[in-house]
Amino acid sequence: MGGSGSRLSKELLAEYQDLTFLTKQEILLAHRRFCELLPPEQRTVEESLHTRVSFEQILSLPELKANPFKERICMVFSTSPTRDSLSFEDFLDLLSVFSDTATPDIKSHYAFRIFDFDDDGTLDREDLSQLVNCLTGEGEDTRLSASEMKQLIDNILEESDIDRDGTINLSEFQHVISRSPDFASSFKIVL
């Protein structure tokens, strides 16, 4: 990646800066990291901007490897019709949302989408159960019993479901998140 064809143009860098919460240096680092996932012959700027990287490759990045929501993160940010790969721009969008400079509203919107496992626009009992399992692990020693899970989800809904419809919508989720001072600082990925 040392040749003249291996750096993003000033115009493209400026456009990416305008469209994301990332600095020029962060965009260049993101491009370098993305290119490292590509075969050597696809590492030119032109190729890298038109090539998709499989989730398997993206998930090999140490920054995502240990995240319990890594598959959902990739699915939410993928623009692929089959939702199984990321383009460089998808990768930039992901890093932008998880950057320190992304707004709390943007972060909470994407957190909601990541936690909405069935993509129906609400967090229902099944979504909340999957969310808890991702956080606690699904091993015998960490998995909650059915009664513990029911009690926990009842408590979450009691606290969060303002309109009492049995689900948490985006505005209810954002209301809860707004009362969590650590959310924005913990919802980040740094390359």
Swiss-Prot record:
One of its GO terms (molecular function) is transmembrane transporter binding. A lipid is attached at residue 2 (N-myristoyl glycine). It is found in: Membrane; Cell membrane, Sarcolemma; Cell membrane; Apical cell membrane. Expressed strongly in Sertoli cells, weakly in pachytene spermatocytes, round spermatids and condensing spermatids (at protein level). Expressed in testis. Expressed in cardiac myocytes and endothelial cells. Expressed in heart, liver, spleen, lung, kidney, brain and inner ear. In the inner ear, expressed in the vestibule, basilar membrane and spiral ganglion cells. Ca(2+) 1 binds at residues 116, 118, 120, 122, 127. Its main location: membrane. Induction: Up-regulated upon cardiomyocytes hypertrophy (at protein level). Ca(2+) 2 binds at residues 161, 163, 165, 167, 172. SMART domains: EFh. CDD domains: EFh. One of its GO terms (cellular component) is neuron projection. Disruption phenotype: Mice grow normally and are healthy; other family members (CIB2, CIB3 and CIB4) may probably compensate for CIB1 loss. Males are sterile: spermatogenic cells can complete both mitotic and meiotic divisions, but postmeiotic spermatids do not develop normally and sperm is not produced. Display increased bone marrow megakaryocytes and circulating platelets. Mice display tail bleeding time increase, impaired thrombus formation and angiogenesis defect after ischemia. Show compromised tumor growth. Does not affect auditory function. GO terms for biological process: angiogenesis; apoptotic process; cell adhesion; cell division; cellular response to growth factor stimulus; cellular response to nerve growth factor stimulus; cellular response to tumor necrosis factor; cytoplasmic microtubule organization. Residues 103-138, 148-183 form the EF-hand domain. Keywords: Angiogenesis, Apoptosis, Calcium, Cell adhesion, Cell cycle, Cell division, Cell membrane, Cell projection, Cytoplasm, Cytoskeleton, Differentiation, Lipoprotein, Magnesium, Membrane, Metal-binding, Myristate, Nucleus, Repeat, Spermatogenesis. It is a lipid-anchor. Calcium-binding protein that plays a role in the regulation of numerous cellular processes, such as cell differentiation, cell division, cell proliferation, cell migration, thrombosis, angiogenesis, cardiac hypertrophy and apoptosis. Involved in bone marrow megakaryocyte differentiation by negatively regulating thrombopoietin-mediated signaling pathway. Participates in the endomitotic cell cycle of megakaryocyte, a form of mitosis in which both karyokinesis and cytokinesis are interrupted. The binding of either calcium or magnesium significantly increases the structural stability of the protein in comparison to apo-CIB (calcium- and magnesium-free form). PANTHER family: CALCIUM AND INTEGRIN BINDING FAMILY MEMBER 2 (PTHR45791), CALCIUM AND INTEGRIN-BINDING PROTEIN 1 (PTHR45791:SF3). Monomer. Interacts with the heterodimeric integrin alpha-IIb/beta3 (ITGA2B-ITGB3). Interacts with ITGA2B (via cytoplasmic domain); the interaction is direct and calcium-dependent. Interacts with the protein kinases PLK2/SNK and PRKDC (via the region immediately upstream of the kinase domain). Interacts with PLK3; the interaction inhibits PLK3 kinase activity. Interacts with PSEN2. Interacts (via C-terminus) with F8. Interacts with NBR1 (via C-terminus). Interacts with FEZ1 (via C-terminus). The EF-hands may also bind magnesium ions in the presence of high Mg(2+) levels and low Ca(2+) levels. This is Calcium and integrin-binding protein 1. The gene is Cib1.
